Regions:
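Bacterial N-terminal signal peptides that target proteins for export
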Residues: 1-10
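N-terminal cationic leader/targeting segments used for protein routing and processing
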Residues: 3-4, 19, 31-33
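Bacterial N-terminal signal peptides
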Residues: 9-20
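Mature catalytic domains of secreted/periplasmic carbohydrate-active enzymes
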Residues: 24-568
Length: 568
């Protein structure tokens, strides 16, 4: 059939039914189309309007119904493991995550550290830390090559955090890494390195919450000899005359020219307002447009394969359609740059079942205790999200064994693990992180066939943790339970004719009994042809009504978590 005839027929049918792609009665003509768009925008308190960057038209439109046509690409389902460089200027002081907020909360560790080492927050605010972020030893090519060598199949870079500082040559944020600090396009360095080494490239963007997150920068001391002297969050461009930041407007960074959120002086209120409810200050039209423009700038300039938002559902949702329009642009742009095939992956948190059809569900530092129908991701970190010297000094990093346990558990449930490895401000990891990653990489080199390209088995696992009820807290935060895993805990994956049984520890008896593979099991009714230990070879096994019992060798190959390859 002729394409022109098909298009005409489709339009005739739409007119006959008096509908449009948005579900609003079709009336025809540009003026009436604009009216339909205006009607659609009335659903949102702060819709995108007057932005500089145009949303790309294509297969998808900015509605949930349209976006539910998304299908997770096979490359992501096969990849299973990625590394994240959650790295930026908040690493300078070594105070850990949310440092640029915590440094304004009187009495906090970050506040005390900043006051002692850098000065009073009225005179030295976070804006003054930015020039100290030099990235002087940062070698993205060397880092990405190493991440690939330990098993990463995709790589994520931080584009901006809640601190609102852009780590690229940003068109819409003058407070960026080309103008201040490293004087480098960090995203360009990461993107080029990832693609040189054959890794898919992702960007995480978090700055939409700067609006409320930075509110403590407007506080002042309640104790001491400078009570009531405001911190630097109130400053404007006019205040910079004669200072290093002359010509820059601190409000472009802090975004505090608005009424405070309800309960703003409560230090813990920010989390409960993450979904823009519970009294959170409503972002302005200009701020929403600015984040939208910055995000499309990243998509258009760096063409990421993956895009991550640290939000409930999508940026500014449900106040704005900005997130829906960003998702639409991301998918359509990806299709246009991948020969008509959708290869993009977009992440959001706290998604309902319908929203999980439109994008990929991300769980922070945790996992559901069940198999999940749609592919999903858990993001975690071996330490704090931003580099924390206290974690280093107190040996509080996750062990390689814990990382393997998390990976096996997540993959058994149809998920991927995105692991953050904190970098110091100069762009390097420390020797303790290196030792952990080396050990993890050794395990992956022996056992990765039980991870890559696999799919969940009939059940995800067996053992005390598998049979317990572990709830997700908000967006995650239950991974501590999985760090307690022993050899009793087994996780399953499958590929072709093989089942992989990953024991999350080496049994003292040198025997593994897999109850789910007992004779007459509801999960596997056929025979077991052979069993081998990856990295070792074939093993003796006995199957009866109690389970499949396998004798392990004395030599503890892959002692972190032995993997049995079971041919059926």
């Amino acid at each position: 059939m002729n394409k022109r005839r098909l298009t005409t027929a489709t339009l005739i049918m739409a007119c006959a039914l008096n509908i449009s792609a948005t579900g609003i009665p079709a009336t025809g003509g540009k003026e009436k189309a604009d009216k339909r768009e205006a009607v659609a925008q009335t659903e949102y308190k702060v819709p995108v309007a007057g932005a500089h960057e145009a949303m790309m038209q294509g297969r998808f439109s900015p509605t949930w119904e349209s976006l539910k046509g998304y299908v997770t690409p096979e490359w992501f389902r096969n990849a299973k493991f990625g590394i994240w460089a959650h790295w930026g200027p908040q690493c300078v002081e070594g105070s850990g995550d949310w440092m640029a907020r915590e440094m304004y909360i009187e009495g906090s560790k970050a506040w005390k550290h900043h006051r002692e080492h850098y000065g009073h927050q009225a005179e030295v605010g976070f804006k003054d830390i930015l020039p100290l972020f030099k990235a002087e030893n940062w070698d993205p090519d060397k880092l990405v090559a190493y991440y690939k060598s330990i098993g990463a199949q995709y790589f994520f870079a931080l584009g901006n955090h809640h601190d609102n500082f852009d780590l690229w040559d940003s068109k819409y944020q003058p407070w960026n890494s080309m103008n201040i600090g490293p004087h480098k396009d960090i995203l360009r360095g990461w993107a080029d390195a990832a693609r040189r080494h054959g890794l898919r490239f992702g960007v995480s963007l978090h700055a939409d919450h700067a609006w409320t997150w930075y509110e403590p920068s407007r506080r002042y001391d309640l104790k001491g000899d400078r009570i009531g002297e405001p911190y630097d969050g109130h400053l404007t461009k006019a205040d910079g005359k004669g200072k290093w930041w002359e010509g820059y407007d601190p409000q472009d960074l802090y975004r505090q020219n608005h009424p405070l959120s309800k309960g703003s002086w409560s230090n813990d209120i920010c989390g409960s307002q993450w979904g823009w409810g519970n009294g959170a200050a409503t972002p302005s039209q200009e701020f929403v447009n600015n984040f939208y423009d910055r995000t499309l700038d990243v998509i258009n300039r760096y063409n990421p394969d993956l895009l991550y938002f640290d939000v409930t559902v999508l940026p500014f949702y449900p106040l704005s359609d900005a997130g829906l329009k960003i998702a639409t642009h991301f998918y359509n742009h990806n299709i246009a740059t991948h020969k008509g095939k959708l290869e993009a992956v977009l992440f959001g948190k706290i998604l309902d079942e319908e929203q999980r059809k439109a994008m990929v569900w991300d769980v922070e530092r945790g996992a559901p205790n069940e198999k999940v129908a749609h592919p999903w991701q858990s993001c975690s970190c071996i330490g704090g999200w931003h580099y924390n010297t206290s974690i280093y000094e107190r040996d509080r990093y996750k062990s390689a064994k814990t990382v393997v346990a998390l990976l096996a558990d997540i993959v058994s449930k149809n998920g991927n693990l995105l692991l953050s490895v904190p970098l110091r401000a100069d762009g390097t990891y420390d020797e303790k992180e290196k030792a952990i990653l080396d050990e993890f990489g050794a395990w992956m080199r022996t056992n990765s066939e039980a991870i890559y390209d696999t799919r969940p088995w009939e059940i995800f696992g067996e053992g005390p943790i598998a049979s317990s009820s572990i709830k997700i807290n908000a967006q995650g935060f239950n991974e501590g339970e999985y760090a307690k895993a022993t050899a009793e805990e087994i996780r399953f994956t499958q590929k072709g004719r093989h089942i992989y049984a990953i024991a999350l520890g080496w049994p003292e008896s040198n025997k593994v009994t897999i109850k789910s593979l007992a004779k007459g099991s509801a999960y596997h009714k056929g025979s077991i042809r052979s069993v081998e230990l990856l990295g070792y070879g074939k093993l003796k096994a006995h199957q009866d009504s109690e389970g499949l019992t396998v004798c392990l060798p004395q030599k503890k190959a892959g002692a972190i978590a032995p993997v049995l390859k079971i041919k059926r």
